Amino acid sequence: MLPIKLFMGREKSGGIVLLLSVALAMVLANTNIATSYFHFFEQKAGFIINGQPFLDYSLHHWINDGLMAIFFFVVGLELKREFIGGELADIRNTLLPIGAAIGGMVVPALIYLGLNFGSPQTMGWGVPMATDIAFALGVVYLLGDKVPASAKVFLTTLAIVDDLGAVLVIAFFYTSELSFVSLLFGFAFLAVMFIGNRLGIKSLLFYAVLGIGGVWVTFLLSGIHATIAAVLAAFMIPADAKINESIYLKRIKKLTRRFEQEDANEVITLEEGQVDVLTHIQHDTSIAIPLLQQLEHKLAPIVTFVIMPIFAIANAGISFTNLSISDVFSTHVALGVTLGLLLGKPIGIIGTTVLMVKLRWASLPSAMSRRTLIGLGMLASIGFTMSMFISTLAFTDELLLTQAKVGIFLASILGGIGGYILLNQPTKKA
């Protein structure tokens, strides 16, 4: 198990697993089992209540609205942590990557709209706005020390803001007809979670029952995408621990002294007194970690190595068997997505960064050259999972969805290769 743990502990591992999952989906979609592959994810699964189906959705729907809700829950936890004490805590230190992220979302959307304005394909404008943080950071960490630490922080902060932007786009622009009664119940459950947080409730069971059985289900029934419920629920999770740092340190020092005073035996097992002390240390350590960070720590590897690969396998498969070049480019969807990601992302990020530096609103991070900035802009054009997710919300027509996926693949592959080549070359600081 040690090699597996070491692999999962590496920053680049998530990107590698995701890439393999995308490759597997492409293979499955273009072999003689393609029909079974597509049919499998269309099978229904749900509940029967009083003889009536309840939440009776396809496996594809469950993955996109259920499993991906866990992904967005972790995104919400990360956003809250960053707002409280992370990269987004001090707006002055993050003004440049925040501005770059906004530019990197606006320009791709404008390019797409410029090519598709006035057509039914307009709804796909949100597809080229998103960056796949797992892939982008995976490439950066593959390069190791060739990318300065300041550049990694810049890209991470940019990706965090990009995630927040994607969440807001989904909430406001990719929501179907609303059931206000269900939505009202959803916000009522959120209010109870908020009140529980303010009252100092730190029980995982309390937030799990209200978050899943209350907020997620009601938002799913309301018409608002259930992933938004996950982000909102994450913001209700307590960020403070049951005991503060000073109390924890006092307890640990006291318990350590007790442990030292216990009579040690000459065998490999511990004395009962020592076991009791270590049990208390284990308990105090667990309650010294905020529930927010406990959940983030436990769920992050599940999201990276289980949920994201499943999502990729279910959504990344494109069958090229009966797909011609004329089919792909019969509309401007593929072109809009490709140019939006491949050109729009770098232009938006680099242009906004240069403008803010010229206006002296911010300064370029130390040790970050112009070539590094361009390389990071290219890596931001890797859309993959987030772009594919938005494409499933934007298009119901299979051909348009396929065109969007082709555009995402083209831009992500070219952007990833281009960014890697640029960042792999040592440069002098600008």
Question: Whereabouts are the PLM-identified features?
Answer:
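Predominantly late transmembrane helices and immediately cytosolic-facing juxtamembrane segments
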Residues: 4, 9-10, 205-208, 214, ...
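Functional cores that coordinate and move charged inorganic groups
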Residues: 140-247, 252-253, 257
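Hydrophobic core segments of alpha-helical transmembrane domains in multi-pass membrane transport
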Residues: 17-30, 71-77, 107-109, 189-194, ...
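Entry/N-cap segments of selected transmembrane alpha helices
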Residues: 82-109, 179-188, 322-344, 374, ...
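Structural signature of hydrophobic alpha-helical transmembrane segments
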Residues: 61-72, 120-134, 175-188, 227, ...
